[in-house]
Regions:
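Start-transfer (signal-anchor) and selected internal transmembrane alpha helices
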Residues: 1-11, 33-135, 281, 289, ...
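Transmembrane signal-anchor helices characteristic of membrane glycosylation enzymes that use polyprenol
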Residues: 7-18, 118-146, 156-160, 404-416
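Transmembrane-helix motifs of polytopic, lipid-linked glycan transferases
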Residues: 76, 227-284, 324
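Short acidic/glycine- and proline-prone juxtamembrane loop motifs at membrane-interface regions
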Residues: 146, 307-317
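Short hydrophobic/aromatic helix or loop-helix immediately within or flanking a transmembrane segment
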Residues: 154, 166-233, 635
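Membrane-proximal stem/loop segments at transmembrane-domain junctions that anchor or position
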Residues: 161, 166-185, 421-557
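Membrane-interface anchor segments at the N-terminal boundary of transmembrane helices
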Residues: 221-231, 235, 520-615
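Membrane-interface alpha helices of multi-pass inner-membrane proteins
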Residues: 349-352, 357-371, 383, 402-408
């Protein structure tokens, strides 16, 4: 059922694409037979992919019997013809072809062994990533947009305040950093402060301090920004190498096997999850050369990963720390042992995380928390799931997940409540609702009742809201921007009590204008789940943004044209049908969702527990301010190769168990009675 729902959602997002590409007149009311055809075809393709994955895992025939039989007969016919004496010339030709095939296979096998040998240690993988990415910070220096400029500005104002410069909220400083996004004035503490949690306060302080030190030494922010980009690239090297080492080399296998031997083998009837884990223990420790090549090729060649290494935009930092975190979860599930005697399964002692993995678990959790405000929701859910699935290692999850969350998230909340910093405006979380109201105000203003207008009048200027509406981005509706902007959101005068009837007004507007409201929702998020949709903001945007190419001090003069050529190439590549899909995040989002559906069908609950964060990240995409914003898809894209490898390994394990069961049953039936 869940698989069908996933396919229906993906098919809907694919089918409505042509409708919403018409920004002015697009609406689901214009649905026609073409959209129906897209919907049916997409649904069939997505469901077919899930069926193929499920049948492969079950050891069943992937291709229909008629097709596989035809291919088999064609191969047999070719072999028979090759054996006919009258076809001696053909035999010689086929022999030469076979030799060439054998030579090619031998060379590929040798290449695979060399790739494996060159990536079978953490330090080797780190060296590959470092060399492969070295050209990025050395030729492009850094990539950034408006966010880091705001963070630097915030820290500068806060630093001036800390060092004794009086900066009241009014007068000459009437338009301050908190007015840019903006944050409602009622949230500002009575004692003026200019440090906010809009861009994650820890990052704001760190980035701002580095930029301030850069200004002290060089007179501009540029050197500090370049240093931050280089540091992020090194962090990306470390995170990706650590996780690749865990997935490709599984260095804990020796420890797990010795623990298993010490405690005895499991016997009796076992669940599918446990039996697959047991069979996987017997699988080769190292991944093959092909898997290594494809995973490394993605990280070293895909624009998503390449440009993210130097993009100082919060999301890449979260994405790389998430990759690190994701790898530790894989180690935890691979070293999971059953608890107690259930279904005839003998209990074994739990395998504790090695010290370096435990420290990595704590640090990756901390970096996630300081780089994305929604990280604590993901971590909180994982704490609950982990304590249910693996409660014998509860101390690991409490120390590595719960304590960092309490310290970082709780500390920031305490600082906000004490007035030391300014929290984020609650309006930020209402992007979907705002887009619905704004689209109705733009397309059918008469459809808003007088009561709804009255309930919204103290919060929004509906005329300005209609003018500011963009189906791709909710930020203009929230009055984000510098002074020359539409004042849709009355952040200067709104009070908490003014929001009391907001939900009531929103519901009434949606009830009176259901089609327009549905348009607003779909137009805001369909691109994340439609592989044919081009990104609203791609990762190459930050490489050639005006903040880099025009408004920087000296970065703009360094390889200016080279940046334009590189981004021009990646944009051209991304526009090529099918081939260009692999350069965009929505391809990896769609495929990850399909793999997750297949895992549900195969009941791989332990693996699904570690993949739940990917589903939550897809929910973040739907509620994000903009449609098809590639930086929000980075975590899912970065771990996609590891998700595929996990599914492949567990499928082979299940097939092995099925064959063993069939062999055992066959042996039993042939024994004399």
């Amino acid at each position: 059922m869940l698989a069908v729902l996933a396919c229906l959602w993906l098919a809907l997002c694919t089918a409505v694409g042509p409708l919403y590409w018409d920004f002015e007149n697009g609406t689901i009311a214009n649905w026609n037979w073409t959209n129906t055809a897209f919907f049916v075809l997409s649904f069939a393709i997505y469901l077919g992919l899930i069926v193929i994955m499920v049948r492969f895992a079950a050891g069943q025939r992937v291709l229909p019997r008629a097709i596989s039989g035809r291919l088999s007969r064609a191969g047999q016919q070719h072999s028979n013809q090759a054996l006919e004496p009258s076809q001696s010339q053909s035999v010689v030709a086929d022999s030469n072809v076979s030799k060439r095939h054998a030579t090619a296979a031998s060379r590929f096998a040798t290449l695979g062994r060399w790739i494996t040998r060159g990536t079978n240690r953490f330090w080797k993988l780190a060296l590959v990533f470092f060399i492969g990415w070295l050209w990025v910070p050395t030729t492009l220096l850094a990539a950034f947009g408006a966010d880091i400029r705001s963070q630097i500005r915030e820290f500068s104002w806060a630093w001036n305040q800390w060092t004794g410069l009086q900066q009241p909220y009014i007068g000459f400083f009437s338009f301050v950093p908190m007015d840019i996004y903006p944050t409602a004035h009622y949230m500002w503490p009575p004692d003026s402060t200019y440090l906010t949690d809009q861009h994650n306060v820890v990052l704001t302080v760190f980035y701002g301090a580095v930029a301030a030190f850069s200004r002290y030494l060089t007179g501009s922010n540029d050197a500090g920004i370049v240093a931050l980009a280089a540091g992020q690239m090194l962090l990306a090297v470390f995170c990706c190498a650590a996780t690749a080492n865990r997935f490709l080399n599984r260095p804990w296998m020796g420890v797990a096997q010795s623990t298993k031997d010490k405690n005895g083998s499991s016997t009796g009837n076992v669940s599918s999850t446990t039996s697959a884990r047991i069979a996987q223990d017997a699988a080769p420790q190292l991944a093959g050369g092909r898997a290594r090549f494809l995973i490394l090729a993605f990280f070293l060649c895909c624009p998503l990963a390449v440009f993210a290494t130097i993009s100082i935009t919060k999301s890449p930092l979260f994405a790389f720390s998430f990759v690190w975190w994701f790898g530790i979860w894989y180690e935890l599930t691979q070293t999971w042992k059953p608890e107690g005697k259930r279904k005839g399964l003998t209990a074994t002692a739990p395998i504790r995380l090695p010290r370096h993995s435990f420290v990595a678990f704590v640090l990756s959790t901390a970096v996630m928390l300081i780089s994305a405000k929604y990280a604590w929701y993901i971590i909180a859910l994982q704490i609950v799931l982990a304590l249910i699935a693996d409660r014998r290692r509860w101390t690991t999850y409490v120390v590595a997940l719960l304590i960092p969350t309490m310290l970082i998230h709780g500390g920031i909340s305490l600082a906000i409540s004490s007035g030391a910093i300014i929290g984020g405006d609650p309006i930020e979380s209402r992007g979907v609702q705002l887009q619905m109201i704004a689209r109705v105000a733009s397309r059918n203003p008469e459809g808003i009742s007088e009561e709804a207008k009255k309930n919204l009048s103290d919060v929004f200027n509906l005329d300005q809201m209609a003018d500011a509406y963009s189906q791709q981005d909710a930020d203009p509706v929230k009055s984000s921007g510098i002074q020359a902007k539409k004042v849709s959101y009355k952040w200067r005068t709104v009070m908490p009590e003014d929001m009391t009837n907001f939900n009531k007004a929103w519901f009434e507007i949606v009830k009176d204008n259901p089609v327009i409201a549905l348009d607003a929702l779909l137009a805001k998020c369909f691109g994340y789940f439609n592989v044919t949709d081009q990104p609203y903001v791609s990762m190459d945007y930050y490489v050639t943004s005006d903040y880099v190419q025009k408004n920087s001090t000296w970065i703009k003069s360094y390889n200016h044209n080279w940046r334009e050529r590189i981004t021009g190439f990646t944009r051209s590549w991304g526009k090529i049908p099918v081939i260009g899909w692999i350069t965009h995040g929505n391809f990896y989002v769609v495929m990850t969702l399909l793999i997750g559906a297949a895992e549900v069908i195969r009941r791989r609950w332990l693996t699904l527990m570690t993949h739940i964060p990917l589903l939550l990240l897809m929910g973040v995409m739907i509620t994000a301010p903009a449609n098809n914003f590639e930086r929000h898809m980075l975590p899912v894209a970065f771990v996609f190769g590891f998700v595929v490898l996990t599914y492949w390994r567990e499928s082979l394990a299940e097939r092995r168990i099925a064959r063993q069961a069939q062999s055992s049953a066959s042996t039993t039936t042939t024994l004399p009675q």
